[in-house]
Amino acid sequence: MLTASLLIFSLILEYIYEPISDKGINSIIQKSFESFKGILEDIITKTLILFLFPVALYILINLLISIVGFVVHPFFSFLINLLILFHCLKPNQFRACIDKLEDKEALETHKNNKNFTRMMKSSKLIYEEILSQIFYNSTRIIYTVTFFFLMLGPAGALSYLIVDSYINESTFKIDTKSKKILKNILGVIEFIPIQLTVLSFALVSDFEICVKSYKSTKNEEGLYNYNRTLITNVGNNLVDQSIENLSQENELDVYKNILSRSFLAWLSVIVLFIFGGFFI
Protein backbone atom coordinates (compact mmCIF):
# COMPACT_ATOMS: atom_id res chain seq x y z
CA MET A 1 0.00 0.00 0.00
CA LEU A 2 3.04 2.27 -0.30
CA THR A 3 1.76 3.78 -3.55
CA ALA A 4 -1.63 4.57 -2.04
CA SER A 5 -0.09 6.03 1.12
CA LEU A 6 2.24 8.32 -0.78
CA LEU A 7 -0.50 9.50 -3.12
CA ILE A 8 -3.06 10.08 -0.37
CA PHE A 9 -0.71 11.92 1.99
CA SER A 10 0.72 14.01 -0.85
CA LEU A 11 -2.74 15.10 -2.03
CA ILE A 12 -3.90 15.84 1.53
CA LEU A 13 -0.83 17.93 2.29
CA GLU A 14 -1.13 19.78 -1.01
CA TYR A 15 -4.80 20.48 -0.33
CA ILE A 16 -4.35 21.63 3.30
CA TYR A 17 -1.32 23.86 3.00
CA GLU A 18 -1.00 27.10 1.10
CA PRO A 19 1.30 26.95 -1.95
CA ILE A 20 4.83 26.38 -0.71
CA SER A 21 7.76 27.93 -2.51
CA ASP A 22 9.76 25.44 -4.57
CA LYS A 23 12.73 27.79 -4.69
CA GLY A 24 14.85 25.67 -2.33
CA ILE A 25 14.34 22.38 -4.17
CA ASN A 26 14.68 24.04 -7.56
CA SER A 27 17.93 25.62 -6.42
CA ILE A 28 19.28 22.21 -5.36
CA ILE A 29 18.33 20.73 -8.74
CA GLN A 30 19.92 23.64 -10.59
CA LYS A 31 23.18 23.37 -8.60
CA SER A 32 23.22 19.60 -9.12
CA PHE A 33 22.83 20.12 -12.86
CA GLU A 34 25.67 22.65 -12.97
CA SER A 35 27.95 20.24 -11.08
CA PHE A 36 26.92 17.36 -13.36
CA LYS A 37 27.57 19.48 -16.44
CA GLY A 38 30.93 20.64 -15.09
CA ILE A 39 32.08 17.04 -14.74
CA LEU A 40 30.98 15.85 -18.17
CA GLU A 41 31.01 18.89 -20.49
CA ASP A 42 34.53 18.11 -21.77
CA ILE A 43 33.63 14.49 -22.42
CA ILE A 44 30.18 14.43 -24.02
CA THR A 45 27.86 16.84 -25.85
CA LYS A 46 25.55 19.24 -24.02
CA THR A 47 22.49 17.49 -25.45
CA LEU A 48 23.63 14.17 -24.01
CA ILE A 49 24.29 15.86 -20.66
CA LEU A 50 20.73 17.18 -20.66
CA PHE A 51 19.44 13.69 -21.39
CA LEU A 52 21.62 11.92 -18.82
CA PHE A 53 21.04 14.32 -15.93
CA PRO A 54 17.45 13.24 -15.07
CA VAL A 55 18.49 9.60 -15.53
CA ALA A 56 21.45 10.00 -13.16
CA LEU A 57 19.30 11.91 -10.66
CA TYR A 58 16.70 9.15 -10.76
CA ILE A 59 19.33 6.50 -10.00
CA LEU A 60 20.97 8.53 -7.22
CA ILE A 61 17.67 9.35 -5.50
CA ASN A 62 16.56 5.72 -5.52
CA LEU A 63 19.97 4.66 -4.25
CA LEU A 64 19.76 7.21 -1.43
CA ILE A 65 16.24 6.12 -0.51
CA SER A 66 17.32 2.46 -0.44
CA ILE A 67 20.30 3.23 1.79
CA VAL A 68 18.23 5.35 4.18
CA GLY A 69 15.52 2.69 4.37
CA PHE A 70 18.04 -0.09 5.02
CA VAL A 71 20.52 1.69 7.32
CA VAL A 72 18.29 4.15 9.22
CA HIS A 73 14.58 3.26 9.04
CA PRO A 74 12.01 2.70 6.26
CA PHE A 75 9.93 5.56 7.68
CA PHE A 76 12.58 8.08 6.63
CA SER A 77 12.75 6.69 3.10
CA PHE A 78 8.95 7.11 3.01
CA LEU A 79 9.33 10.75 4.07
CA ILE A 80 11.87 11.40 1.30
CA ASN A 81 9.52 9.86 -1.26
CA LEU A 82 6.63 11.91 0.13
CA LEU A 83 8.63 15.14 -0.05
CA ILE A 84 9.56 14.48 -3.69
CA LEU A 85 5.99 13.61 -4.71
CA PHE A 86 4.65 16.63 -2.81
CA HIS A 87 7.04 18.80 -4.83
CA CYS A 88 5.95 17.22 -8.13
CA LEU A 89 2.19 16.63 -7.97
CA LYS A 90 0.06 19.77 -7.49
CA PRO A 91 -3.51 19.41 -8.76
CA ASN A 92 -4.94 21.79 -6.17
CA GLN A 93 -2.43 24.53 -7.02
CA PHE A 94 -3.25 24.08 -10.69
CA ARG A 95 -6.93 24.56 -9.89
CA ALA A 96 -6.06 27.65 -7.83
CA CYS A 97 -4.22 29.08 -10.84
CA ILE A 98 -7.34 28.57 -12.95
CA ASP A 99 -9.33 30.47 -10.30
CA LYS A 100 -6.95 33.41 -10.72
CA LEU A 101 -8.11 33.71 -14.32
CA GLU A 102 -11.49 34.95 -13.05
CA ASP A 103 -10.06 38.46 -12.94
CA LYS A 104 -8.91 38.96 -16.53
CA GLU A 105 -7.69 42.48 -15.84
CA ALA A 106 -5.31 41.28 -13.12
CA LEU A 107 -3.42 38.76 -15.27
CA GLU A 108 -0.50 41.13 -15.69
CA THR A 109 0.02 41.09 -11.91
CA HIS A 110 0.83 37.37 -12.08
CA LYS A 111 3.67 37.66 -14.59
CA ASN A 112 6.27 37.60 -11.78
CA ASN A 113 4.57 34.69 -10.04
CA LYS A 114 6.79 31.79 -11.12
CA ASN A 115 4.33 29.20 -9.86
CA PHE A 116 1.52 30.71 -11.96
CA THR A 117 3.60 31.18 -15.11
CA ARG A 118 4.92 27.60 -14.87
CA MET A 119 1.48 26.04 -14.49
CA MET A 120 -0.31 28.37 -16.91
CA LYS A 121 2.46 28.23 -19.50
CA SER A 122 1.56 30.02 -22.73
CA SER A 123 3.27 32.09 -25.42
CA LYS A 124 1.59 35.26 -24.09
CA LEU A 125 0.02 36.19 -20.76
CA ILE A 126 -3.36 36.71 -22.40
CA TYR A 127 -6.59 35.18 -21.11
CA GLU A 128 -7.58 33.47 -24.38
CA GLU A 129 -4.05 32.15 -24.95
CA ILE A 130 -3.85 30.74 -21.43
CA LEU A 131 -7.26 29.07 -21.78
CA SER A 132 -6.22 27.42 -25.04
CA GLN A 133 -3.29 25.74 -23.26
CA ILE A 134 -5.00 24.70 -20.01
CA PHE A 135 -5.52 21.08 -20.99
CA TYR A 136 -1.96 20.51 -22.16
CA ASN A 137 -0.64 22.25 -19.06
CA SER A 138 -2.85 20.01 -16.92
CA THR A 139 -1.06 16.97 -18.32
CA ARG A 140 2.32 18.52 -17.45
CA ILE A 141 1.31 19.35 -13.89
CA ILE A 142 -1.07 16.50 -13.02
CA TYR A 143 -1.57 13.52 -15.32
CA THR A 144 1.91 12.83 -16.70
CA VAL A 145 3.41 13.38 -13.23
CA THR A 146 0.93 10.85 -11.81
CA PHE A 147 1.73 8.37 -14.59
CA PHE A 148 5.48 8.48 -13.99
CA PHE A 149 4.98 8.29 -10.23
CA LEU A 150 3.05 5.05 -10.76
CA MET A 151 5.59 3.64 -13.22
CA LEU A 152 8.87 4.82 -11.68
CA GLY A 153 8.06 6.20 -8.24
CA PRO A 154 8.48 9.79 -6.99
CA ALA A 155 12.00 10.00 -8.44
CA GLY A 156 10.55 9.16 -11.86
CA ALA A 157 8.00 11.97 -11.52
CA LEU A 158 10.81 14.38 -10.62
CA SER A 159 12.89 13.25 -13.60
CA TYR A 160 9.94 13.91 -15.90
CA LEU A 161 9.51 17.42 -14.48
CA ILE A 162 13.16 18.14 -15.19
CA VAL A 163 12.78 17.09 -18.83
CA ASP A 164 9.61 19.19 -19.03
CA SER A 165 11.41 22.20 -17.55
CA TYR A 166 14.02 21.98 -20.33
CA ILE A 167 11.26 22.90 -22.79
CA ASN A 168 8.70 24.87 -20.82
CA GLU A 169 10.75 26.87 -18.32
CA SER A 170 13.72 29.22 -18.40
CA THR A 171 15.54 27.45 -15.55
CA PHE A 172 17.86 25.71 -17.98
CA LYS A 173 19.38 27.57 -20.90
CA ILE A 174 18.94 25.30 -23.90
CA ASP A 175 20.13 25.98 -27.44
CA THR A 176 17.70 25.56 -30.34
CA LYS A 177 19.25 22.32 -31.63
CA SER A 178 19.15 20.64 -28.22
CA LYS A 179 15.61 21.85 -27.59
CA LYS A 180 14.44 20.30 -30.86
CA ILE A 181 15.93 16.94 -29.87
CA LEU A 182 14.48 17.18 -26.37
CA LYS A 183 11.04 17.95 -27.80
CA ASN A 184 11.21 14.67 -29.72
CA ILE A 185 12.13 12.85 -26.51
CA LEU A 186 9.38 14.62 -24.56
CA GLY A 187 6.89 13.71 -27.28
CA VAL A 188 7.64 10.01 -26.74
CA ILE A 189 7.58 10.39 -22.94
CA GLU A 190 4.21 12.17 -22.92
CA PHE A 191 2.47 10.05 -25.55
CA ILE A 192 0.97 7.34 -23.31
CA PRO A 193 -0.06 9.69 -20.43
CA ILE A 194 -1.82 12.01 -22.88
CA GLN A 195 -3.60 9.10 -24.55
CA LEU A 196 -4.79 7.97 -21.12
CA THR A 197 -5.88 11.50 -20.27
CA VAL A 198 -7.94 11.70 -23.46
CA LEU A 199 -9.53 8.38 -22.50
CA SER A 200 -10.38 9.73 -19.05
CA PHE A 201 -11.95 12.82 -20.65
CA ALA A 202 -14.07 10.52 -22.81
CA LEU A 203 -15.20 8.49 -19.80
CA VAL A 204 -16.31 11.48 -17.72
CA SER A 205 -17.58 13.75 -20.50
CA ASP A 206 -18.97 13.38 -24.03
CA PHE A 207 -17.47 10.20 -25.50
CA GLU A 208 -18.61 10.96 -29.06
CA ILE A 209 -16.96 14.40 -29.13
CA CYS A 210 -13.73 12.92 -27.80
CA VAL A 211 -13.70 10.28 -30.54
CA LYS A 212 -14.39 12.85 -33.27
CA SER A 213 -11.67 15.17 -31.95
CA TYR A 214 -9.25 12.26 -31.68
CA LYS A 215 -9.83 11.13 -35.25
CA SER A 216 -9.61 14.66 -36.66
CA THR A 217 -6.20 15.36 -35.08
CA LYS A 218 -3.39 14.47 -37.48
CA ASN A 219 0.22 13.73 -36.62
CA GLU A 220 1.93 16.03 -39.13
CA GLU A 221 4.46 18.04 -37.11
CA GLY A 222 6.07 15.44 -34.86
CA LEU A 223 4.88 13.59 -31.78
CA TYR A 224 5.43 16.49 -29.36
CA ASN A 225 3.18 18.87 -31.33
CA TYR A 226 0.69 16.06 -31.97
CA ASN A 227 0.34 15.43 -28.22
CA ARG A 228 -0.26 19.11 -27.53
CA THR A 229 -2.74 19.48 -30.37
CA LEU A 230 -4.62 16.30 -29.47
CA ILE A 231 -5.25 17.08 -25.80
CA THR A 232 -6.02 20.72 -26.64
CA ASN A 233 -8.53 19.81 -29.36
CA VAL A 234 -10.30 17.19 -27.27
CA GLY A 235 -10.47 19.39 -24.17
CA ASN A 236 -11.54 22.58 -25.92
CA ASN A 237 -14.21 20.80 -27.96
CA LEU A 238 -15.63 19.35 -24.74
CA VAL A 239 -15.68 22.82 -23.20
CA ASP A 240 -17.43 24.31 -26.24
CA GLN A 241 -20.06 21.57 -26.16
CA SER A 242 -20.62 21.94 -22.42
CA ILE A 243 -21.01 25.72 -22.68
CA GLU A 244 -23.45 25.27 -25.56
CA ASN A 245 -25.55 22.80 -23.54
CA LEU A 246 -25.30 24.78 -20.30
CA SER A 247 -25.29 28.37 -21.47
CA GLN A 248 -25.44 29.79 -17.94
CA GLU A 249 -22.40 27.93 -16.62
CA ASN A 250 -19.18 29.81 -15.98
CA GLU A 251 -16.54 29.03 -18.61
CA LEU A 252 -13.79 28.38 -16.07
CA ASP A 253 -16.08 26.10 -14.07
CA VAL A 254 -16.41 23.90 -17.15
CA TYR A 255 -12.61 23.56 -17.39
CA LYS A 256 -12.33 22.77 -13.69
CA ASN A 257 -15.18 20.24 -13.77
CA ILE A 258 -13.67 18.30 -16.67
CA LEU A 259 -10.24 18.23 -15.04
CA SER A 260 -11.62 17.31 -11.60
CA ARG A 261 -13.78 14.48 -12.91
CA SER A 262 -11.02 13.07 -15.09
CA PHE A 263 -8.51 13.14 -12.22
CA LEU A 264 -11.04 11.36 -10.01
CA ALA A 265 -11.34 8.75 -12.77
CA TRP A 266 -7.56 8.32 -12.68
CA LEU A 267 -7.62 7.93 -8.90
CA SER A 268 -10.44 5.39 -9.11
CA VAL A 269 -8.52 3.25 -11.60
CA ILE A 270 -5.36 3.57 -9.48
CA VAL A 271 -7.27 2.28 -6.44
CA LEU A 272 -8.49 -0.72 -8.46
CA PHE A 273 -4.93 -1.47 -9.60
CA ILE A 274 -3.65 -1.18 -6.03
CA PHE A 275 -6.25 -3.64 -4.73
CA GLY A 276 -5.51 -5.83 -7.72
CA GLY A 277 -1.87 -6.04 -6.66
CA PHE A 278 -0.38 -4.15 -9.61
CA PHE A 279 1.14 -1.49 -7.33
CA ILE A 280 2.66 -2.09 -3.91
Which residues does each predicted region cover?
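Hydrophobic N-terminal alpha-helices or hydrophobic patches in metabolic proteins across all domains
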Residues: 1-280
